[in-house]
Design a protein with these regions (language model features):
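Left-handed beta-helix
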Residues: 29, 34-35, 40-41, 49, ...
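A transmembrane-helix-recognition feature enriched in membrane-embedded lipid enzymes
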Residues: 1-30
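C-terminal segments of enzyme domains that contribute to small-molecule binding surfaces
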Residues: 96-120, 149-173
């Protein structure tokens, strides 16, 4: 019910109050979570794992935040439309096909391109770039650009002492 209710509130302030007081999330100042109709938040509070979204981070519409395993997103992170952050999976060799959960940690100044998928247990280092459509199955080192399925190193980003601020707040978001 939370997904359907909160996705349609056209007020940044009310949504952020909901995240903090009802879901127990920590959302930094200036963070923009553009929910719309297509973002889903699963496992929001019952697991006891924390969700933290840093200052000036932008999460665009159409993203899937599967938070049961825990989700830590740094500051000044740009998450493009359609990105999936999936902290859970299944033990495929277990007779009962049991599920398991691992946290996702995303460092500061990371850019995740459209429709990329980040799996549980992954850490993405500061300043890294995940190209559109990539499926990240291993940790990504700082300032590394990865792409493909599964994601592989494409190049290194020449970024020293990043200081930019993401500032994206549409009128009715």
């Amino acid at each position: 019910m939370t997904n359907h209710f909160i996705n349609h509130i056209p007020s940044y302030t009310l949504r952020h109050a909901w995240y903090h007081h009802v879901l127990g999330w920590r959302v930094g100042s200036g963070a923009a979570i553009l929910l719309g109709q297509h973002v889903q938040m699963a496992g929001v509070r019952s697991s006891g794992h924390k969700v933290s979204i840093g200052c000036d981070t932008v999460i665009n519409q159409g993203c899937m935040l599967y938070t049961t395993g825990g989700l830590i997103i740094g500051e000044h992170v740009s998450i493009s439309s359609g990105v999936w952050l999936v902290t859970g999976s299944h033990e495929m060799n277990h007779p009962a096909f049991v599920d398991f959960y691992k946290p996702i940690v995303i460092g500061n100044y990371v850019w995740i391109g459209m429709r990329a998928t980040i799996l549980g247990g992954i850490t993405i280092g500061e300043g890294a770039v995940v190209m559109a459509g990539a499926v990240v199955t291993h940790d990504v080192a700082p300032c590394t650009v990865v792409g493909g399925v599964p994601a592989r190193v494409i190049t290194q980003r020449e970024l020293t002492n990043p200081s930019y601020t993401l500032d994206f707040h549409p009128l009715f978001e």
